[in-house]
Amino acid sequence: MKRTFQPSKLVRKRRHGFRARMATVGGRKVLARRRAQGRKRLSA
């Protein structure tokens, strides 16, 4: 059985990047929550 994590910088950015988060209402809520927590990195 192959490993489930097959790293790809492009896929990582597209799925979890800042612009991907900003594109949806839910993603914006994610960023808002992380800002409220004081996270250093908001997204991938």
From Swiss-Prot:
GO biological process: translation
Recorded GO MF terms: structural constituent of ribosome
Annotated Pfam families: Ribosomal_L34 (PF00468)
A single Gene Ontology CC term: ribosome
Keywords: Ribonucleoprotein, Ribosomal protein
Highest taxon listed in the record's lineage: Bacteria
Family matches, as InterPro entries: Ribosomal_bL34 (IPR000271), Ribosomal_bL34_CS (IPR020939)
Family: Belongs to the bacterial ribosomal protein bL34 family.
Protein name per the record: Large ribosomal subunit protein bL34
Organism of derivation: Rhodospirillum centenum (strain ATCC 51521 / SW)
Gene it is expressed from: rpmH
